[in-house]
UniProtKB/Swiss-Prot annotation:
Keyword NAD: no
The record's free-text note on cofactor binding: Binds 1 [4Fe-4S] cluster.
Protein name: Periplasmic nitrate reductase
GO BP annotations listed: cellular respiration; Mo-molybdopterin cofactor biosynthetic process; nitrate assimilation
Gene Ontology MF term list: 4 iron, 4 sulfur cluster binding; electron transfer activity; iron ion binding; molybdenum ion binding; molybdopterin cofactor binding; nitrate reductase (cytochrome) activity
SMART domains hit by this protein: Molybdop_Fe4S4 (SM00926)
UniProt cross-references to Gene3D superfamilies, sorted A to Z: 2.40.40.20, 3.30.200.210, 3.40.50.740, Dimethylsulfoxide Reductase, domain 2
Organism: Shigella dysenteriae serotype 1 (strain Sd197)
Modification comment: Predicted to be exported by the Tat system. The position of the signal peptide cleavage has not been experimentally proven.
Catalytic activity: 2 Fe(II)-[cytochrome] + nitrate + 2 H(+) = 2 Fe(III)-[cytochrome] + nitrite + H2O
Superkingdom assignment: Bacteria
Protein family according to the UniProt entry: Belongs to the prokaryotic molybdopterin-containing oxidoreductase family. NasA/NapA/NarB subfamily.
Keywords: 4Fe-4S, Electron transport, Iron, Iron-sulfur, Metal-binding, Molybdenum, Nitrate assimilation, Oxidoreductase, Periplasm, Signal, Transport
Length: 828
């Protein structure tokens, strides 16, 4: 067999991914494809990360039996990462939940009782009583929901409607708060609109790739295979990788940079200074399309107001800024000299200069990629703003092959959490609850009384934990997320609230996760192709899939759960009289009738489905629920830069990148000839801002919330590994992936281990000011920390590393810093 170069690169990428999991390529094929006769195939996006790879799902006799890369999918072109090849097995773990479970004692609910099987009606009976009691006694602020960037688009939309319009509570937030909130605020501050302006097609046209806190080789391996192909096929292409420790992406790096935690802010300002000092500003672009502003500083760390760091902050939580001149900006970044930067970061001068030269060279098309290294950062918004500065100074933006690109970690952190607006402060299409005009638009479209949606921002993820602990949030429903394992400071700020007898906790999940086992009621959930769905990936690509099998037992989709539960409430039970008086025709109606079974949503008949097409929710209700919800939601974005295509178009396509105008998707936003919202002669227009100009921010270095000292003498950073996704609730139930990486380890520099009389394979106690875990010493693995730093993945439920993490957040985005806290080690 003769392989083309492209085929050779793909084959090597598959082999590398398979080898990482201890499998041969034929072994992968045999494990997931099996016998293809009589298998029915249909398309779907992958269930895992935000890359949005397309897969072909094979079903047989009511089960998913096979999965392969979709050769027609433009994202991955037929290639899967190792997790993608094992997608069928995530659905059939031996401990899959199939019926609701309630803590009971002597036949009744008891907070200290044992989990006991009950019916869905019984589950909703208990939930109804708890919700109504909380609403009556303490009001809408006493209930809350924690959702997910893994929700389908219509699940997130239905949840947001139920809480913000139905229950009149903005206490709904997604787990994307922990991963993408800093990116969102960064986009909004700089451009006035969320999400990247570029797309994956940039990869094949770029001259340089700079990774800021992104281990794409393991976390976005399919995109990394495309970057690898570009780098190895073109000797003039350069790859720079910046991180606080060495990882697999360094294997391709021409310039691999290890910097002191938090000092990425220094490097970013140094590069801006270098660009100015070397007259590398694109003056035409800069003068026409950019404003300069100086941001507020000393903004705190998002901790409780009583924390000493918050008391000491001069401008806690401030996102204020003021205009500044170019001369003032030039003077501001001039402080970040090469010498000072090298001293503060620990990076050799020659490496810093090489990096800066990539951005300054007018002939180099540069893509900046980042993920959690930037976002999970107490100055994550600033880091996002500062990397935009580099592209705005040089004009390397919104054109093929160059631009800043924020990568996402979840399959629909963009499509659901961000675009739908399931954050505590957001509404669809970049609208926000604090804006009266935005609330009015939603209330009119939803045909609910004016004033229904609260103007006050609800509780964000970390604030929800604190409110539960303080007894202020009393009924809490989490869906499609495992926050007891994934969130910070488990011992001090999360577990106390979940187990507080004042509070009732509901967890909807397919498996008995750490979160489920800490709850009071567990609802069994349909997953992936057991329901019809839609995700939006990192490049603004919206992708649909059909329901292909039915969920086991009594498991139901999150959408079904939300819609059916809404039947339990009448408007008089959730809205005050002054609202009902504005729309008396809504009296006596259930929230189901007001929010979901409306003429707008229910107008698409179930007959639009093919006779043999599964769709459990729509067939039960008698109308095409998913289509109705999507078309209502899509209305919000059409006409002002967030345009989604008609519903039916997505079932025909392998995804479309918004804005989709006149049937054509958009690859590059904000530039003439690429974006339908930029008129001829405008060149560039950042139309999220009233004047069409993007903002360069002057923002300084500020230290981390916690750093090593004499007692807690090591930095701890947390993250993921190739074989497991997030908390491992799916991937650890795949035998092959579990065997490949069965338990978490503590990656440590050999000299740090030796100084503590530790050897590879030893058990070690990792201790912070908040908790401790026992792990296993690893001095040779794929991750190579420098002296003074240790790294630990968070997929292992037996090693809850987030017991150790401080619940410090970026004060602007409220996103947790999972990359930096101080620990000490004790030999076990």
């Amino acid at each position: 067999m003769k392989l083309s170069r492209r085929g050779f690169m793909k084959a090597n990428a598959v082999a590398a991914a398979a080898a990482a999991a201890g499998l041969s390529v034929p072994g992968v094929a045999r494990a997931v494809v099996g016998q293809q006769e009589a298998i029915k195939w249909d398309k779907a996006p992958c269930r895992f990360c935000g890359t949005g790879c397309g897969v072909l799902v094979g079903t047989q006799q009511g089960r998913v039996v096979a999965c392969q890369g979709d050769p027609d999918a433009p994202v991955n072109r037929g290639l899967n990462c190792i997790k993608g090849y094992f997608l069928p097995k995530i659905m059939y773990g031996e401990d899959r939940l199939t019926q609701p479970l309630l803590r009971m004692k002597n036949g009744k609910y008891d907070k200290e009782g044992e989990f006991t099987p009950i019916t869905w009606d019984q589950a909703f009976d208990v939930m109804e009583e708890k919700f109504k009691t909380a609403l009556k006694e303490k009001g809408p602020e006493s209930i809350g929901m924690f959702g997910s960037g893994q929700w389908t688009i219509w699940e997130g939309y239905a949840a947001s409607k139920l809480f913000k319009a139905g229950f009149r509570s903005n206490n709904i937030d997604p787990n994307a708060r922990h991963c993408m909130a800093s990116a969102v605020v960064g986009f909004m501050r700089t451009f006035g609109m969320d999400e990247p302006m570029g797309c994956y097609d940039d990869i094949e046209q770029a001259d340089a790739f700079v990774l800021w806190g992104a281990n794409m080789a393991e976390m976005h391996p399919i995109l990394w295979s495309r970057i690898t192909n570009r780098r190895l096929s073109n000797q003039n292409v350069t790859v720079a990788v910046l991180s606080t420790y060495q990882h697999r992406s360094f294997e391709l790096a021409d310039n691999g940079i290890i910097f002191t935690p938090q000092s990425d802010l220094v490097i970013l300002n140094y590069i801006a200074n270098y660009i100015i000092q070397n007259n590398a500003i694109n003056q035409d672009f800069f003068s026409k399309h950019v404003n300069l502003r100086k941001g507020a500083t000393d903004i705190g760390y998002g901790l409780r107001p009583t924390h000493p760091l918050e008391k000491a902050a001069k401008n806690p939580g401030s996102d204020a800024s003021e205009p500044m001149s170019f001369e003032d900006y030039k003077a501001f970044v001039a402080e970040y000299t090469l010498e000072k930067t090298a001293e503060m970061t620990g990076v050799p001068k020659d490496q810093l200069e090489q990096l800066a030269q990539l951005y300054a060279d007018p002939n180099k098309k540069v893509i900046s990629y980042w993920t959690m290294g930037f976002n999970q950062h107490t100055r994550g918004v600033w880091a996002n703003n500062l990397v935009y500065n580099l592209h705005l100074l040089t004009g390397k933006i919104s054109q093929p092959g160059c631009g800043p690109f924020s990568l996402t970690g979840q399959p629909s952190a963009c499509g659901t959490a961000r675009e739908v607006g399931t954050f505590a402060h957001r509404l669809p299409a970049d609208m926000v609850v604090t804006n009266e005009k935005h609330r009015d638009i939603c209330e009119k479209k939803w045909n609910i009384p004016s004033g229904t949606i609260p103007a006050k921002i609800g509780l964000h993820a970390v604030a929800q934990d604190r409110a539960l602990k303080d007894g202020k949030l009393n009924v809490y429903w989490t869906m499609c997320t495992n926050n007891m394992q994934a969130g910070p400071n488990i011992n001090e700020e999360r577990m106390p609230g979940w187990r507080d007898p004042r509070n009732f906790i509901i967890v909807s999940d397919p498996y008995p996760t750490v979160s489920a086992l800490a709850a009071d009621l567990i609802l069994p959930t349909a997953m992936w192709v057991e329901k019809e769905g839609a995700y939006g990936n990192a490049e603004r690509r919206t992708q649909f899939w059909r329901q292909q099998v039915q969920a086991p037992g009594e498991a139901k989709s999150d959408l079904w759960q939300l819609v059916q539960f809404s039947r339990r409430f009448k408007t008089e039970e959730v809205w005050p009289e002054e609202l009902l008086a504005k729309k008396p025709e809504l009296r006596g109606k259930t929230l189901y009738e007001v929010l979901y079974a409306t003429p707008e949503v229910s107008k698409f008949p179930v007959s639009e489905l093919a006779e043999d097409q599964l769709n459990d929710e729509s067939r039960e209700l008698g109308f095409y629920l998913q289509k109705g919800l999507f078309e209502e939601y899509a209305w919000f974005g059409r006409g002002h830069g967030h345009d989604l295509a008609p519903f039916d178009d997505y079932h025909k396509a392998r995804g479309l990148r918004w804005p989709v105008v006149n049937g054509k998707e958009t690859q590059w936003r904000y530039s003439e000839g690429n974006d339908p919202y930029v008129k001829a002669g405008e060149g560039y227009k950042f139309y999220g801002k009233p004047d069409g100009k993007a903002v360069i921010f002057a923002l300084p270095f500020e230290p981390a919330a916690e750093a090593p000292d004499e007692e807690y003498d090591l930095w701890l950073s947390t993250g993921r590994v190739l074989e497991h996704w997030h908390t491992g609730s799916m991937t650890r139930r795949v035998p092959e992936l579990h065997r490949a990486f069965p338990e978490a380890v503590l990656f440590i520099h050999p000299l740090d281990a030796k100084a503590r009389d530790l050897r590879r394979g030893d058990k070690v106690k990792v201790v912070s000011r908040r908790g401790e875990v026992i792990s296993i010493v690893e001095t040779r693995g794929r991750n190579r920390p420098p002296q003074g730093l240790v790294y630990m993945p968070f997929f292992d439920a037996a090693q809850l590393v987030n017991k150790l993490m401080l619940d410090a957040t970026d004060p602007l985005s409220k996103e947790t810093d999972f990359k930096k806290c101080a620990v000490k080690l004790e030999k076990v």
